[in-house]
């Protein structure tokens, strides 16, 4: 992509926008940063853009496809692209191979981050410079996707891709790609579930070596079957059941591959490892977290699809620990007859993720902290499906009505406490105190809110940290010593 002497409008100066602006300026591009909230922006309104002299637009995920400036650019025939598209077109040759580093792309409604981290961990153990990038990126601009794509030292990029990023991305041809699952999320942004699924499916288009898909998700399986991939690209389904030919899954307590990605023939059963070797995939009592097992299977299929050493990858996977706020035990209080465990799954920001979290625990054992910014979601199906697990619910957030209505209609016998949303600073302390009134030995206080966090917290991480602090305080005050 030739960007010297071109004019690019960067819409939104967050980490990715600011980083891309720097990368483009280094290549002789005239960059116009537009952000109404950033004093350092070149312009603070799209009304001030001189569209007659614009060659490209980079749109932040903040802006949906129906935003006026997006429509204006498209009306004029100006390409509107994501940071992902720019990064893909700007990528440079690896200094050792002389060709661009392979990209492994991971998308899905849930499980993206854990899968991306596992993939990076295994490839790093195999001796490759394989950073995580994309939607997973921290505030470190040196690790933004545009920076990683233009760094000749990286051997592989493990890229978490959101549906927002994929919408304005069209030329990807990933080496390996995965869709973990698809459930209703961000439908208002995309304009419907079919548009949402279509954007997710872009990771499969023209994939070169392997695509990995959730064989237990009908929509994902359909997208994989329809995917137009490069000749010789392997299609690997993952399942939590015994795998069929073309799949990797769990059989008799073992991870078993029948896809051929682990070295056997397609249909041949190859035992890879005992599931008990992966302590991070299970609760303290040894029962498995199904969604983490699914993430591990996905990541393993991706790295094997790239050609990584099987034994080294498996060894790294056994020692992997998920990042914070992903079904993480943050406190445990001794009570009469046993203990109460506090589990932080603040990363469960939608109903699909919360369902996976709740389903990991025994019947009537969970005091569930739920609620937040609902983003138009309804929770009737979630509450109905998980009512057998939930002992009591404590509802937080400023958008409480959808969750309240779900319990009233689907599980009226489950006790519910509603936390006054007015004081953000004390909301989690009050929520944990309310949970404590329901607890008994063996119970789990689970914070998996099924909602976004920005109504009362800075981020899901801030929400999780506050829950952990409140849980530790409650345990010190109320636990037996």
Swiss-Prot record:
Q: Which GO terms describe its cellular component?
A: cytoplasm
**Physiological role:** Cell wall formation. Catalyzes the addition of glutamate to the nucleotide precursor UDP-N-acetylmuramoyl-L-alanine (UMA).
Query: What EC number is given for this enzyme?
Result: 6.3.2.9
Question: Quick one: where is this thing mainly located?
Answer: cytoplasm
Per UniProt, the keywords (alphabetical) are:
ATP-binding, Cell cycle, Cell division, Cell shape, Cell wall biogenesis/degradation, Cytoplasm, Ligase, Nucleotide-binding, Peptidoglycan synthesis
Describe the family membership recorded for this protein in Swiss-Prot or TrEMBL.
Belongs to the MurCDEF family.
Query: Does the record bear Ribonucleoprotein in its keywords?
Result: no
Q: Which top-level enzyme class is recorded in the Swiss-Prot or TrEMBL entry?
A: ligase
The organism sits in which domain of life?
Bacteria
Q: What is this protein called?
A: UDP-N-acetylmuramoylalanine--D-glutamate ligase
Q: Where in the cell is it found?
A: Cytoplasm
Single GO MF annotation: ATP binding
Enumerate the catalysed reactions: UDP-N-acetyl-alpha-D-muramoyl-L-alanine + D-glutamate + ATP = UDP-N-acetyl-alpha-D-muramoyl-L-alanyl-D-glutamate + ADP + phosphate + H(+)
UniProt binding sites for ATP: 108-114
Single GO biological process annotation from the record:
cell wall organization
Q: Which organism is it from?
A: Bifidobacterium longum (strain DJO10A)
């Amino acid at each position: 992509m030739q960007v010297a002497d071109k004019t690019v409008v960067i819409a939104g100066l967050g980490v990715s926008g600011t980083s891309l602006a720097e990368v483009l300026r280094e290549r002789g591009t005239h960059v116009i940063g537009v952000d109404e909230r950033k004093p350092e922006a070149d312009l603070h309104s799209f009304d001030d853009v001189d569209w007659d002299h614009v060659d490209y637009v980079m749109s932040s995920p903040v802006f949906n496809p129906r935003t006026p400036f997006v429509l204006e650019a498209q009306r004029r025939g100006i390409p509107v692209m994501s940071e992902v598209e720019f990064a893909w077109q700007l990528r440079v040759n690896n200094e050792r191979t002389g060709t661009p580093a392979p990209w492994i792309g991971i998308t899905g409604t849930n499980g993206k981050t854990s899968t991306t981290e596992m993939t990076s961990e295994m490839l790093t153990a195999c001796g490759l410079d394989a950073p995580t990038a994309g939607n997973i990126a921290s505030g470190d601009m040196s690790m933004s996707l545009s920076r990683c794509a233009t760094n000749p030292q990286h051997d592989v990029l493990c890229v978490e891709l959101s549906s927002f990023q994929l919408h304005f991305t069209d030329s990807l041809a990933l080496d390996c790609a995965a869709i973990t699952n698809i459930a209703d999320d961000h439908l208002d942004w995309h304009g419907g579930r079919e548009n949402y699924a279509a954007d997710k499916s872009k990771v499969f288009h023209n994939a070169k070596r392997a695509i990995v898909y959730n064989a237990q998700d009908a929509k994902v399986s359909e997208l994989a079957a329809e995917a137009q991939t490069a000749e010789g690209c392997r299609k690997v389904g993952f399942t939590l059941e015994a795998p069929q030919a073309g799949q990797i899954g769990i059989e008799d307590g073992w991870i078993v591959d029948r896809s051929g990605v682990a070295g056997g023939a397609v249909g041949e059963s190859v035992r890879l490892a005992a599931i008990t070797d992966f302590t991070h995939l299970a609760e303290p009592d040894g029962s498995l977290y199904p969604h983490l097992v699914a993430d591990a299977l996905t990541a393993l299929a991706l790295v094997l699809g790239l050609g990584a050493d099987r034994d080294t990858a498996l060894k790294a996977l056994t020692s992997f620990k998920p990042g914070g706020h992903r079904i993480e035990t943050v406190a445990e209080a001794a009570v009469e007859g046993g203990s109460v465990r506090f589990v932080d799954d603040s990363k469960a920001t939608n109903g699909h993720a919360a369902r996976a979290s709740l389903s990991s625990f025994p019947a009537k054992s969970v005091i569930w902290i739920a609620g937040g910014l609902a983003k138009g979601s309804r929770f009737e199906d979630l509450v109905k499906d998980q009512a057998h697990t939930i002992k009591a619910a404590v509802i937080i957030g400023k958008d409480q009505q959808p969750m309240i209505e779900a319990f009233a209609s689907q599980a009226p016998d489950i006790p519910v406490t509603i936390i006054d949303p007015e004081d953000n600073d004390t909301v989690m302390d009050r929520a944990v105190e309310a949970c404590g009134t329901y607890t008994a030995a063996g119970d789990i206080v689970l914070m998996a809110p099924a909602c976004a966090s920005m109504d009362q917290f800075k981020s899901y991480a801030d929400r999780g940290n506050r829950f952990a602090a409140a849980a530790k305080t409650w345990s010190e005050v109320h636990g037996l010593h």
